Swiss-Prot record:
<dbReference type="GO" id="GO:0003735">
    <property type="term" value="F:structural constituent of ribosome"/>
</dbReference>
<dbReference type="Pfam" id="PF00333">
    <property type="entry name" value="Ribosomal_S5"/>
</dbReference>
<comment type="similarity">
    <text>Belongs to the universal ribosomal protein uS5 family.</text>
</comment>
<dbReference type="GO" id="GO:0019843">
    <property type="term" value="F:rRNA binding"/>
</dbReference>
<feature type="domain" description="S5 DRBM">
    <location>
        <begin position="11"/>
        <end position="74"/>
    </location>
</feature>
<dbReference type="InterPro" id="IPR013810">
    <property type="entry name" value="Ribosomal_uS5_N"/>
</dbReference>
<dbReference type="InterPro" id="IPR018192">
    <property type="entry name" value="Ribosomal_uS5_N_CS"/>
</dbReference>
<protein>
    <recommendedName>
        <fullName>Small ribosomal subunit protein uS5</fullName>
    </recommendedName>
</protein>
<dbReference type="Pfam" id="PF03719">
    <property type="entry name" value="Ribosomal_S5_C"/>
</dbReference>
<comment type="function">
    <text>With S4 and S12 plays an important role in translational accuracy.</text>
</comment>
<keyword id="KW-0687">Ribonucleoprotein</keyword>
<dbReference type="InterPro" id="IPR005324">
    <property type="entry name" value="Ribosomal_uS5_C"/>
</dbReference>
<dbReference type="GO" id="GO:0006412">
    <property type="term" value="P:translation"/>
</dbReference>
<keyword id="KW-0694">RNA-binding</keyword>
<dbReference type="InterPro" id="IPR000851">
    <property type="entry name" value="Ribosomal_uS5"/>
</dbReference>
<comment type="function">
    <text>Located at the back of the 30S subunit body where it stabilizes the conformation of the head with respect to the body.</text>
</comment>
<comment type="subunit">
    <text>Part of the 30S ribosomal subunit. Contacts proteins S4 and S8.</text>
</comment>
Length: 176
């Protein structure tokens, strides 16, 4: 997806992970904090970023700035779910995202739920397979979101009309 201009006042921020990291130096150990943040406007734009600093708040601020730099636009179906089922991978992590009927809600694990809430998705079913590492799962989720396409963009790519394209969940096969 394409990069998007950011607007600070409309962005929601979710702190996904905070770790204390240690660097061993000649005089002993040096401690710092690592933070992972997901930001979004709840209307189809989302980004994730990582920051490291001596204090938690500084690390969180750096992570938020990194997330705003990496924001992307995701096409939503009826402003509540994704257009089609998709699989994303990152290392040993694999996520399967499936569109859901209205009223289903967000059925997803911790870090994926933060992404969907920041994105503004209300109905989706997500399954993680393999690694449950927070960084890998978020990366795999973003890989899946990058593969999403609206019927309009698919039709333009194929030089067809939107009504000539049919996307059914049953037609998509997921290799596990």
């Amino acid at each position: 997806m394409s990069k998007v201009k950011k607007n600070d006042e409309t962005l929601s921020e979710v702190l996904v992970d905070v770790n204390r990291v240690t660097k061993v130096v000649k005089g002993g150990r040096s401690f710092a904090f690592s933070a992972y943040v997901v930001v979004g406007d709840k209307a189809g734009r989302v980004g994730a970023g990582h920051g490291k600093a001596k204090e938690v708040n500084e690390a969180r601020g750096k992570a938020k700035q990194a997330a705003k730099k990496r924001m992307m636009k995701v096409p939503l179906y009826q402003n509540r779910t994704i257009h089609h089922d998709v699989v994303g991978k990152s290392g040993a992590a694999k996520v399967i995202l499936r569109r859901a009927k209205a009223g289903t809600g967000v059925i997803a694990g911790g870090s994926m739920r933060a992404i969907f809430d920041s994105l503004g998705i209300h109905d989706v079913v997500a399954k993680s397979i393999g690694s449950t590492n927070v960084y890998a799962m978020i990366s795999a989720t973003f890989d899946a979101l990058n593969k999403l396409a609206s019927p309009k963009s698919i039709a333009m790519r194929r030089d067809k009309k939107v009504n000539e394209i049919s996307v059914k969940s049953a037609d998509i096969q997921v290799n596990e």
